[in-house]
Amino acid sequence: MTGKIVQVLGPVIDVDFTDYLPEINEALETTFMFEGKEQKLVLEVAAQLGDNRVRTIAMDMSEGVVRGQEVKATGDSIQVPVGEEVLGRIFNVIGEAIDEAGPVEAKTHWSIHRDPPPFEDQSTKTEVFETGIKVVDLLAPYSKGGKVGLFGGAGVGKTVIIMELINNVAMKHSGYSVFAGVGERTREGNDLYYEMKESNVLDKVALCYGQMSEPPGARNRIALTGLTMAEYFRDEMGLDVLMFIDNIFRFAQSGSEMSALLGRIPSAVGYQPTLSREMGALQERITSTTKGSITSVQAVYVPADDLTDPAPASVFAHLDATTVLNRSIAEKGIYPAVDPLDSTSRMLDPQIIGEEHYNVARGVQQILQKYKDLQDIIAILGMDELSEDDKLVVERARKIEKYLSQPFHVAEVFTGSPGVYVTLEDTIEGFKGLLEGKYDDMNEAAFYMVGNMAEAIAKNDKINAK
């Protein structure tokens, strides 16, 4: 079951076998000397060219690979370690630990190419997944086993929200998380590791990195590596897992690079013709079964802010909720900078979340929308020109806006305020009181960066005492 390399075109390598034809997605291995060190390279079969020749995609840099070099067929697809042993470690696409903390002694290895759970095993019940973040739980609640898109530009706090969610899941649901860094910056991956170490959530999370500098094969398949680890926790251990993908756009982007390298005819905007199938194959595996669930949060980069671009458009079809981060909110110093009017959720339905929650959420959105409409008048004529009713709307809206902020556990290091987890009941109760005017006489500053309403009242008393 050995073959010889006959052609090397960057990350695409053709291999000839004499009496064996490897299957599509089968892993092949080759070892060679490069710069005085022995290197191991894993290739994944992408196409069968006939005459026992296969075209493969390299899972690492192919420098030093020469024609005539021997390649061994493994008879199986890429296998990665799964189970509790993977927690607290960093892996590359082929499941090797890259954090210099020794090999991973995993008892089980699974293939990264798996079928989605069959229909009869999928769970159909809709449950709200409580995150402890007020603005998310109130206005765009996540569903257990659902998919959330996290949209935002650079530096508005996508990664901080991701870390807070990992922290809250580890704390409240004592669950595990898997983080797949798909084609993002090495520096960010490094920062994330050390920040998690500092905020003590590292032992509850497995990290899989395929950074920007990797060849397209590694950047594409890393999403499957992370997902496989999450599936083990769901299927074999019956857990509710959180799966983070940062960034799902890079999954589509690397797929398009691979497709071009394999000589396939491109479709719209130069993307691969199989874009929606590839996206579907990944997303279909992220689901709830009768045993456990995978709730996924996917950061989505939108190229040139064009939501109709085929890559983000192919993600939209799969999402249950969107959390949109807005720079203008971050500039006001309100964190998390979630846009309360732009974020949506399939769960915001009175039949799922109940009448009370639904009415409070819609009430909050109405007041904020009215405030937004009045902002032009305020900017030109000032507050004094508004009617009494409008003044009240503005006052309440400003309090609501402030109350949508909250201190995070993972940001404690640089804000100095201890993080809070706010239960859904407390969240609904607080905003209901604000809408009913219970807190009209309180100081606006009392609502900024607090958890529940009791904290705001205590803060207000402190301000008044001064």
Curated annotation (Swiss-Prot):
Keyword flag rRNA processing: no
Catalysed reactions, semicolon-separated: ATP + H2O + 4 H(+)(in) = ADP + phosphate + 5 H(+)(out)
GO cellular component terms, semicolon-separated: plasma membrane; proton-transporting ATP synthase complex
EC number assigned by the record: 7.1.2.2
Cystine pairings recorded for this chain: none
Pfam families for this protein: ATP-synt_ab (PF00006), ATP-synt_ab_N (PF02874), ATP-synt_VA_C (PF22919)
Main enzyme class: translocase
PROSITE patterns registered for this protein in UniProt: ATPASE_ALPHA_BETA
Localisation per UniProt entry: Cell inner membrane
Membrane-topology annotation of the record: Peripheral membrane protein
An annotated Gene Ontology molecular function: proton-transporting ATP synthase activity, rotational mechanism
Residues reported to bind ATP: G152, G153, A154, G155, V156, G157, K158, T159
SMART domains named in the record: AAA
Entry keyword set: ATP synthesis, ATP-binding, Cell inner membrane, Cell membrane, CF(1), Hydrogen ion transport, Ion transport, Membrane, Nucleotide-binding, Translocase, Transport
CDD domains from the UniProt entry: ATP-synt_F1_beta_C, ATP-synt_F1_beta_N, F1-ATPase_beta_CD
Summary of subunit composition and partner proteins: F-type ATPases have 2 components, CF(1) - the catalytic core - and CF(0) - the membrane proton channel. CF(1) has five subunits: alpha(3), beta(3), gamma(1), delta(1), epsilon(1). CF(0) has three main subunits: a(1), b(2) and c(9-12). The alpha and beta chains form an alternating ring which encloses part of the gamma chain. CF(1) is attached to CF(0) by a central stalk formed by the gamma and epsilon chains, while a peripheral stalk is formed by the delta and b chains.
PANTHER family per UniProt: ATP SYNTHASE (PTHR15184), ATP SYNTHASE SUBUNIT BETA, MITOCHONDRIAL (PTHR15184:SF71)
Entry-linked NCBIfam families: atpD (TIGR01039)
Function per UniProt: Produces ATP from ADP in the presence of a proton gradient across the membrane. The catalytic sites are hosted primarily by the beta subunits.
Similarity field: Belongs to the ATPase alpha/beta chains family.
UniProt name for this protein: ATP synthase subunit beta
Organism field: Sulfurovum sp. (strain NBC37-1)
